[in-house]
Each structure stands twice: as structure tokens, then as C-alpha cells.
């Protein structure tokens, strides 16, 4: 260090560094002080520029001198100040030493391993050794035992590492300490080594690989999970492999992996859950979860199975009992149900693409007929008289009601562009929503609220994905005939959805967490109060039915509460019973005609035409539909009072039950009223058929009997 700087420079540098003189030569301490003073003297930090320059110059000179002094040949050079005075004996010695050769003939150079042994001095130099390429994968004999997943989150407890001999020896100790392995062994494999080890806890392959790669900067390393632990270890102990070392003397045995008394863990059958969802057509995750959890209890003492009221339960309880018991303890209940529901929706998507609309409607009718067989069967709780009463009430809602329903079904099946939507318009409590709800259940579909803001409307329209029809319920607008009607933006929104209503082009429908679905928007119904409809929207309706409130229908409902309590008049089954009662068998699809015939025969046996006409008579009179067996004087007085109220307009009630108008530019042919199989009765009789409706002319009241 004394030759690096002279004394004046060294003192000056130590003063600039702020160190004691005794610290001269302590390079780390001087380096730390230098970095600290650089921040202090730097001009950008407000320091002294001259001191900064002087300190940098001296420190750089000192640093270069230290590096030069540590060179191996330092001291083999001479300095001009060290040359003796010319002419003296010292100068002669120095001169002789300066001219002395470093290599003498008596010396021999050690031979190198890389030198050629050829005798000729003109022989070809030796070729460079070729670098051996690193293997790309484990030996082929072991591939069947390994997992080949690359980007998997699966966790394992058994791994294998393929690397060089040197790194394998290092990793053997490092992995044993890092993961507290249960067992580890090192094996020879084609000039390389393989590590096989078991961990007490499960890890991802990527975690093991990342740790091992830190210790193998240049050496190759391949890390994989092991699927077949014992087969892998057994193969590593046989040729062409061999054991170098292992943590357990004697290694592993087969019974270490397959204990004799091990019990097989029973797994939930996802397939059975999916089959149940498909058979019941359940597309609600939570509903499916709740129904399947009910199967975990014994079916022998199940009240639902004893009563046999719910076919979705008692038909499947015994079959799914064992699987549901395992399902109840599963941690993936919702995931299993979600997959089952997705399968149901996928089947529905396939049907919407592959089946015709007529086939889809036929399948819907089959489902309704199955429900009717259960409802009105021996174990069912439904009363067919009440449902036929609902048919009688619905048939009085509009003239030729069965033909209206038949026309609507044809319109939905044909699905002709710009001739796909019906408009139900009328005041409050006129029957619009009742009929729309029944038609919706008859065909299958969804009801949509179009009165929402535009930013929420897209997701509301997404509900229509893969549906047979939709109902835009209670659409609000502006400029209604009555000032009491609330205003809304529903009609304006519908006017902006002309391409949806037309059905000429496919539109994009979206749901949350799902990709957009491009399809023809389904046809359907629009219900509204007496709002004004713009011409651009009116042109999208093939038929408009104007509803009017009718007092006799309202009074009949008040006296027949079961029609509303059991939602009979809003049910598609009531409309299907109406079609079975009124329409000929030939108008139904051929595949269900046999079932229609069976139901026609059953209705003929259980209901005569006179009984049905009594029901319609009671509807027109505004009394209870099933109140035709009245014997008390009070009931006779009530009936007479209702008859007097309707005496002047008995037939008018039926004639004014509603009227329908077709769109001028898009008219649709109407169907003739069905011809009844019964003969036309005389007008003098109390109940008979007259132009498809009941002529309600009561016979003259007999004179009172004289008192005795």
C-alpha cells in the first residue's frame, strides 16, 4: 500500500474520506467511506465539486495501484529510480542479471494431456471433443410411470428428478432437508442419476422443479410427478438402472403402497346426478342440490314416497339413495350439480338446433300429458272437475277460444319472419296476463320485463336463449287512453328491438359469465294496457286481440276461488284440456294422437256435454262454476237475481266476450269453429249448443204449488 500513493496523497485521501490514518489499507472500510462521501460531495446534492474531483482522482489512483500490486508478476519489473550508478560494481551485477535468459536448455516443460503423440512434427492436431447433448426426457422405460402434465395444478406426494451425477448427489441431501422426505433414493441411469423421493405432504410439480433449478444453473434437470410409485421404484432397482443410495435400508416394498386392510373410498357418481337432472329436466343448481339431498334418507320410511305426490322424488329415491348418501358428505356438491345443470342446458341447446319447432312443441305436449297422467291418476290429488271448470271459464274469455289457441300455436310453430308476435291489449283485469301465462306454460318459455333501462336490458333479453317463445309482460308506454296509466319506456325499448321482433336476422344474446349466443330471437306475446303503439311497432304484430273486462267473469272468479288458488286458469294444462275437448284428433301431431284419443275417451266418460254446458252457463251467469246443484231457497234466489241481471244480455255476455283484429299488412287466416260430435239441441231446452256457444235461455219458472 505504501507504493500505491505517496505520503502526501495518502494523507489527503484519508482526510477527504473522513477516516483515521490507521485505517489506511482497510479497503472495505475505505470503499464504504468513499460511497458515503460521494453522496455528500456530489454537486447535485449541494456538495463541493472540487473536493469531489480530487477524491475521485486519488481514490481511482489508489484502486488501480492495489489491483496492479496483486498481479502475480508484480515485482518482476524494475523502476528507473532503482538502477545503480553507471560504472560501479552494483551496476555491473544489475546489468548481468538484466541480460540473463529465463529459459535454459537443461530445463524440461511438462507434457500436456492434449498434446498429440504423433512422431511427425507435421501431424494433424487433435480434434476437439464433442459435447454430449443433454437428454430431453426420462428414459423410455420409465415414461409409463410418470405424469406428463406441464401446466397442471395437481398436487402429488411422489416425484422423480433426472440430472447429472454431481447435481444428483447435491440434490439428494438438499431435498431430504428441505421437504423432510419420507423416502429418497438415488439411481444410476445411462451416465446420469435419477432421484426418486416421497414427501409427507402434497406439492405441485412446479414447486419441486423451481427449487431444484436454483441448484442447477448449468446442468440439465428434468422433474416430473410419479403416478405409479411402486412400479417406478421397482423399475429403478432393475437393469439397466441400479441403486446408489437410499434413505431406508432395504428400500420400499409393495405393501408400503397397498396395505392389506385398506378400505376403498367411495366416490360420488357424477353420472347418476346428471342422469337425474336430465330425466327431471332441472336447470336450477340450488333446486337440484336440494332435491338430491332428500335422497340421502331411507326410502322405506319416506313420506313423499308413501304418498307418491311428487314424481320427481318417489320415482328416483330408491335408485339414487346410495349415491345421495355419499353426495351428502361431498365437498363438491355445488360443482357436481352445476355440471349436471350444464348438461341439461347443453341438451336443450342441441334440441333447439336439431329439432323442428313442431317436434319441440310435441315434446312439450308429451311432458304436459305426463304431468296430467300423474295429477289425475290414482295417486294424484288434482280434481278433474275443477280443471274442466277452468276450461269452461277460459273458453268464455274470448269467442272461439279454442280456435284462438290453435291459431297461436300454428303461428309459433311456423315462426314466419315479421309474423311472429301477438299483441294482447286491454284495460286492467281484462284477462290479458291470464291467457298469456297459460299460453306460456303450454308452449314453454320465459317472461321478460322490457321496462328496464337500456343498460340492463341486454341481460334481460339473454334469458330468452334457447327458449321456444317469450312473453313481454305488461309493457308500459306514454300517451295512453287513460291518464291513470303510469308511463314507462317499455314501448320505446320494443321499438328499438325491431330486429328481435322481426326474426329475419340472428341477434346476439348474452348472460353473465357466458359467451354471447347468436340466434334468431324467439317469437311470442306482448301484453300491455291501452297505450298508443307507434306504427313501426304495430307492423311487427301479426294479430292484436283487444280485451275488455267482463263483470260476469269477475263474479264467477269471486265465487270459484279454487280457479285462482290452484292457478288453474293460468295453467297450460287447462288450455291443453280445452284443445283435447274441442279440437279433432287429426289436428294433433301423429306421435301423440294415441294419447289424445285416450284422454278424449276419458273426458267423454267422466263428463257429459250437458255437465260442461252447465259449467259454461254458470260462468255466464256470474256464479260459481260448479254451483249447478243448488237446492236451497237462498241459492235459487241468488241464481234468479243473477239471471235477471243477465236476462237482457245473456247471449250478449258470450258475444261480447272479446274481439280480435288482425294487422292489415300481415293478416292471418282464421280457423272455423270445431264441429261438435253432439247434436244441436232445441232452443226450448235449458242447455244446448248454438253456434259454438251456449244459448242461455232459461225455461219458464213453474207456478208455485198451492198451499194445502
Curated annotation (Swiss-Prot):
Compartment list: Host nucleus
Regulation: DNA helicase activity is inhibited by ATP-gamma-S.
The reaction(s) this protein catalyses: Couples ATP hydrolysis with the unwinding of duplex DNA by translocating in the 3'-5' direction; ATP + H2O = ADP + phosphate + H(+)
Modified residues (Phosphothreonine): 124, 701
Domain SF3 helicase: 400-560
Positions of region (CPD): 699-708
Residues noted as binding ATP in the record, renumbered to the chain: 426-433
Region (ATPase activity): 418-616
Subunit structure: Isoform large T antigen forms homohexamers in the presence of ATP. Interacts with host HDAC1. Interacts (via LXCXE domain) with host RB1; the interaction induces the aberrant dissociation of RB1-E2F1 complex thereby disrupting RB1's activity. Interacts (via LXCXE domain) with host pRB-related proteins RBL1 and RBL2. Interacts (via C-terminus) with host TOP1 and POLA1 allowing DNA replication. Interacts with host TP53, inhibiting TP53 binding to DNA. Interacts with host preinitiation complex components TBP, TFIIA and TFIID to regulate transcription initiation.
Free-text function comment from the UniProt entry: Isoform large T antigen is a key early protein essential for both driving viral replication and inducing cellular transformation. Plays a role in viral genome replication by driving entry of quiescent cells into the cell cycle and by autoregulating the synthesis of viral early mRNA. Displays highly oncogenic activities by corrupting the host cellular checkpoint mechanisms that guard cell division and the transcription, replication, and repair of DNA. Participates in the modulation of cellular gene expression preceeding viral DNA replication. Isoform 17kT antigen targets host RBL2 for degradation and promotes cell proliferation. Transactivates host cyclin A promoter through its J domain.
Protein name per UniProt: Large T antigen
Amino acid at each position: 500500500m505504501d507504493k500505491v500513493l505517496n505520503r502526501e496523497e495518502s494523507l489527503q485521501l484519508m482526510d477527504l474520506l473522513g477516516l483515521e490514518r490507521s485505517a489506511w489499507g482497510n479497503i472495505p472500510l475505505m470503499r464504504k467511506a468513499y460511497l458515503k462521501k460521494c453522496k455528500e460531495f456530489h454537486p447535485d446534492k449541494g456538495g463541493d465539486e472540487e473536493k469531489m474531483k480530487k477524491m475521485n482522482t486519488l481514490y481511482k489512483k489508489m484502486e488501480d495501484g492495489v489491483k496492479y500490486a496483486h498481479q502475480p508478476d508484480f515485482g518482476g519489473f524494475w523502476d528507473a529510480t532503482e538502477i545503480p550508478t553507471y560504472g560501479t560494481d552494483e551496476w555491473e551485477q544489475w546489468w548481468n542479471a538484466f541480460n540473463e535468459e529465463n529459459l535454459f536448455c537443461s530445463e524440461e516443460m511438462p507434457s500436456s494431456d492434449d498434446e498429440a503423440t504423433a512422431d511427425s512434427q507435421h501431424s494433424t492436431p487433435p480434434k476437439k471433443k464433442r459435447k454430449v447433448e443433454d437428454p430431453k426426457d426420462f428414459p423410455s422405460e420409465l415414461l409409463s410411470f410418470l405424469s406428463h402434465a406441464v401446466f397442471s395444478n395437481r398436487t402429488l406426494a411422489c416425484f422423480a428428478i433426472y440430472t447429472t451425477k454431481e447435481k444428483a448427489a447435491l440434490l439428494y441431501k438438499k431435498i431430504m432437508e428441505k421437504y423432510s422426505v419420507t423416502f429418497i433414493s438415488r439411481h444410476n441411469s445411462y451416465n446420469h442419476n435419477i432421484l426418486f423421493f416421497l414427501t409427507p405432504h402434497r406439492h405441485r410439480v412446479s414447486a419441486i422443479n423451481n427449487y431444484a433449478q436454483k441448484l442447477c444453473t448449468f446442468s440439465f434437470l428434468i422433474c416430473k410427478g410419479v403416478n405409479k410409485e411402486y412400479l417406478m421404484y421397482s423399475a429403478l432397482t432393475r437393469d439397466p438402472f441400479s441403486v446408489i443410495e437410499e434413505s431406508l435400508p432395504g428400500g420400499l416394498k409393495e405393501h408400503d403402497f397397498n396395505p392389506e386392510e385398506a378400505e376403498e373410498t367411495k366416490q360420488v357418481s357424477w353420472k347418476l346426478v346428471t342422469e337425474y337432472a336430465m330425466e327431471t329436466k332441472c336447470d336450477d343448481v340450488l333446486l337440484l342440490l336440494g332435491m338430491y339431498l332428500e335422497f340421502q334418507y331411507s326410502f322405506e320410511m319416506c313420506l313423499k314416497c308413501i304418498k307418491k305426490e311428487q314424481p320427481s322424488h318417489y320415482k328416483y329415491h330408491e335408485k339414487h339413495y346410495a349415491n345421495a348418501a355419499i353426495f351428502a358428505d361431498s365437498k363438491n356438491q355445488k360443482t357436481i350439480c352445476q355440471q349436471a345443470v350444464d348438461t341439461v342446458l347443453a341438451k336443450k341447446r342441441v334440441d333447439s338446433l336439431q329439432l323442428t319447432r313442431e317436434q319441440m312443441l310435441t315434446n312439450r305436449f308429451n311432458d304436459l300429458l305426463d304431468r296430467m297422467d300423474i295429477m289425475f291418476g290414482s295417486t294424484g290429488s288434482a280434481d278433474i272437475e275443477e280443471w274442466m271448470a277452468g276450461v269452461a271459464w277460459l273458453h268464455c274469455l274470448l269467442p272461439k277460444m279454442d280456435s284462438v289457441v290453435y291459431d297461436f300455436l300454428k303461428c309459433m310453430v311456423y315462426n314466419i319472419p315479421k309474423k311472429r308476435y301477438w299483441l294482447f291489449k286491454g284495460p286492467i283485469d281484462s284477462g290479458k296476463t291470464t291467457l298469456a301465462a297459460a299460453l306460456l306454460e303450454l308452449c314453454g318459455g320465459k317472461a321478460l320485463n322490457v321496462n328496464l333501462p337500456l343498460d340492463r336490458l341486454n341481460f334481460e333479453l339473454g334469458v330468452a336463449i334457447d327458449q321456444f317463445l317469450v312473453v313481454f309482460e305488461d309493457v308500459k308506454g306514454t300517451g295512453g287512453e287513460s291518464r291513470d296509466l303510469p308511463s314507462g319506456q317499455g314501448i320505446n325499448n320494443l321499438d328499438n328491438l325491431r330486429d328481435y321482433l322481426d326474426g329475419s336476422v340472428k341477434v346476439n344474446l348474452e348472460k353473465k359469465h357466458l359467451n354471447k349466443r347468436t340466434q334468431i330471437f324467439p317469437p311470442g306475446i306482448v301484453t300491455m294496457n291501452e297505450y298508443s303503439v307507434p306504427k313501426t311497432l304495430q307492423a311487427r304484430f301479426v294479430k292484436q286481440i283487444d280485451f275488455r273486462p267482463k263483470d260476469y267473469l269477475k263474479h264467477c272468479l269471486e265465487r270459484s276461488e279454487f280457479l285462482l288458488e290452484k292457478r288453474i286458469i293460468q295453467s297450460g294444462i287447462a288450455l291443453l284440456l280445452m284443445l283435447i275437448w274441442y279440437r279433432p284428433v287429426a289436428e294433433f301431431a301423429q306421435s301423440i294422437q294415441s294419447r289424445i284419443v285416450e284422454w278424449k275417451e276419458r273426458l267423454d266418460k267422466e263428463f257429459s256435454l250437458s255437465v260442461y254446458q252447465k259449467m259454461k252457463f254458470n260462468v255466464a251467469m256470474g256464479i260459481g262454476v260448479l254451483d249447478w246443484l243448488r237446492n236451497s231457497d237462498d241459492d235459487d234466489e241468488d241464481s234468479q237475481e243473477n239471471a235477471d241481471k243477465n236476462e237482457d244480455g245473456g247471449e250478449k255476455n258470450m258475444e261480447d266476450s272479446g274481439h280480435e283484429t288482425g294487422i292489415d299488412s300481415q293478416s292471418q287466416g282464421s280457423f272455423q269453429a270445431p264441429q261438435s260430435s253432439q247434436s244441436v239441441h232445441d232452443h226450448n231446452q235449458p242447455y244446448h249448443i248454438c253456434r259454438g256457444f251456449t244459448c242461455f235461455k232459461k225455461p219458464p219458472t213453474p207456478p208455485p204449488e198451492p198451499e194445502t
